[in-house]
Amino acid sequence: MPCRPLQGLVLVGLWVCATSLVVRGPTVSLVSNSFVDAGALGPDGVVEEDLLILGELRFVGDQVPHTTYYDGGVELWHYPMGHKCPRVVHVVTVTACPRRPAVAFALCRATDSTHSPAYPTLELNLAQQPLLRVQRATRDYAGVYVLRVWVGDAPNASLFVLGMAIAAEGTLAYNGSAYGSCDPKLLPSSAPRLAPASVYQPAPNQASTPSTTTSTPSTTIPAPSTTIPAPQASTTPFPTGDPKPQPPGVNHEPPSNATRATRDSRYALTVTQIIQIAIPASIIALVFLGSCICFIHRCQRRYRRSRRPIYSPQMPTGISCAVNEAAMARLGAELKSHPSTPPKSRRRSSRTPMPSLTAIAEESEPAGAAGLPTPPVDPTTPTPTPPLLV
């Protein structure tokens, strides 16, 4: 794989810092606003600030897996300075990841990672930011890093080029040599899918700790120190398959907790996922809280309302009615003097029956007229008989 100078990567990285860039691969895409970081060596020979590369692996468009759960693997290669072949720095194997049209390799059931002891302060994190971090980097960490991503049973891997530039004595340390002497099968562009045992192993006299298999690189990284062993060159072919099983008579060491995926890695959430969960949850909580407040307010108004008495008119204690006794007496005399009239027909009269005029006159007289003296009546004068209405 031809290697370009890191000066070009630095210029491209400075331009990309202003906006996000999506690099699309065959099976997955890398979203980042910077693919390179640079630092300067301090008096003690290390970079005081951490070198960071932010980014996320995402499925874009038709890259979303068709199966409900998928497996995958991620390999990190390093092109060191000088005439040295690339090395495998980190290998991650994920199992049973749920299909999601967003961040790749999230909420996987198991995550196994193997890290090279020659790079103790380098971290590769797929679930959290930053994607690549180097703490107290020395000049040995400078160079080009290649991220190879395998998804499912895809025959081709997605390659993403990253860069770390370190300035020493006023110049940028970069790799400008060709790799024509390296085996083509040991290059990221042509190497097959590697096993976790393919990580770079330094010489026995240079290694401070043996190679370990961890779920997250940060759990086994020792404390940074001013003296960091330099990565050594290696031309040993990488094994492309699983290691051969030992005979039944050989005692196998029990696997430690570091060789298996921890529970934290299974349920690790990114910032975007947390925001996507927090927004609907907060809306539901606000609606529920508002409903409770309205219910309590209505209940308080109901109990505070003063109960007004129902209107009931008062019945009079006594009924007073003025009765014209004289009119009643004359009406009784008329009924006795006249014979009973035949029963009226059932046919309804069209005329409204009128009462006796004398009765009306008597009833219309004021109450004070009854007490006045009446003039004498001549017995010879016939008394007029009032007409009867039929």
Curated annotation (Swiss-Prot):
Signal peptide: 1-20
Subcellular location: Virion membrane; Host cell membrane; Host cell junction; Host Golgi apparatus, Host trans-Golgi network
Compositionally biased tracts (Pro residues): 373-390
Region (Disordered): 200-261, 334-390
Protein task: In epithelial cells, the heterodimer gE/gI is required for the cell-to-cell spread of the virus, by sorting nascent virions to cell junctions. Once the virus reaches the cell junctions, virus particles can spread to adjacent cells extremely rapidly through interactions with cellular receptors that accumulate at these junctions. Implicated in basolateral spread in polarized cells. In neuronal cells, gE/gI is essential for the anterograde spread of the infection throughout the host nervous system. The heterodimer gE/gI serves as a receptor for the Fc part of human IgG. Dissociation of gE/gI from IgG occurs at acidic pH. May thus be involved in anti-HSV antibodies bipolar bridging, followed by intracellular endocytosis and degradation, thereby interfering with host Ig-mediated immune responses.
Record's subunit section: Interacts with gE; this interaction enhances the Fc receptor function of gE.
Protein name per its UniProtKB record: Envelope glycoprotein I
Statement: the UniProt record of this protein carries the keyword Endoplasmic reticulum: no
Topology, Virion surface side: 21-276
